């Protein structure tokens, strides 16, 4: 089943401790997520990323809906696996600032559907 943007808006309230989305969104503890869909990881303007996030972006990670859905249950494990699979295991050091986890698959699909509304199609 695809995500429901209305339900995703409710799920996104959990993310708002660190993130904002929308035309006036600013970086907080986490980067603003306006335009995040298909964006290269580690490239939100003006945000100071952790080394592992920056390395994943340099290694080619883009925030496709599928990658976001795979990332949210365990951000650090996802980034380490991505870097290892890309042949950059030596850069999989440290951890992302994102300690929040979203284990429920339907909630992940819903929040991606919500974020898609703020990204050019």
UniProtKB/Swiss-Prot annotation:
Signal peptide: none
Molecular function, one GO term: metal ion binding
Gene3D superfamilies recorded: Cytochrome c-like domain (1.10.760.10)
InterPro entries on file: Cyt_c-like_dom (IPR009056), Cyt_c-like_dom_sf (IPR036909), Cyt_c_1A/1B (IPR002327)
Keyword Iron belongs to the record: yes
Pfam families found in the cross-reference section: Cytochrom_C
The entry's keywords: Electron transport, Heme, Iron, Metal-binding, Photosynthesis, Transport
BP-aspect Gene Ontology terms: photosynthesis
Residue ranges of coiled coil: none
UniProt cross-references to PROSITE patterns, sorted A to Z: CYTC
Post-translational modification: Binds 1 heme c group covalently per subunit.
UniProt-annotated binding residues for heme c: 15, 18-19, 98
Family: Belongs to the cytochrome c family.
Role according to the record: Cytochrome c2 is found mainly in purple, non-sulfur, photosynthetic bacteria where it functions as the electron donor to the oxidized bacteriochlorophyll in the photophosphorylation pathway. However, it may also have a role in the respiratory chain and is found in some non-photosynthetic bacteria.
Official protein name in the record: Cytochrome c2 iso-2
């Amino acid at each position: 089943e695809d995500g429901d943007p209305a339900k995703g808006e409710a799920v996104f309230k959990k993310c708002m401790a660190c993130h904002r989305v929308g035309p006036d969104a600013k970086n907080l503890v986490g980067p603003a997520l306006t335009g995040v869909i298909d964006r290269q990881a580690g490239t939100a303007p003006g945000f100071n990323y952790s080394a592992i996030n920056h390395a994943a972006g340099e290694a080619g990670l883009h925030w496709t809906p599928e990658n976001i859905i795979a990332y949210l249950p365990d951000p650090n494990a996802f980034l380490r696996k991505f870097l290892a699979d890309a042949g950059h295991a030596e850069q999989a050091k440290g951890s992302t600032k994102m300690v929040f986890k979203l284990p429920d698959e339907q909630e992940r699909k819903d929040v991606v559907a919500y974020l898609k509304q703020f990204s050019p199609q």
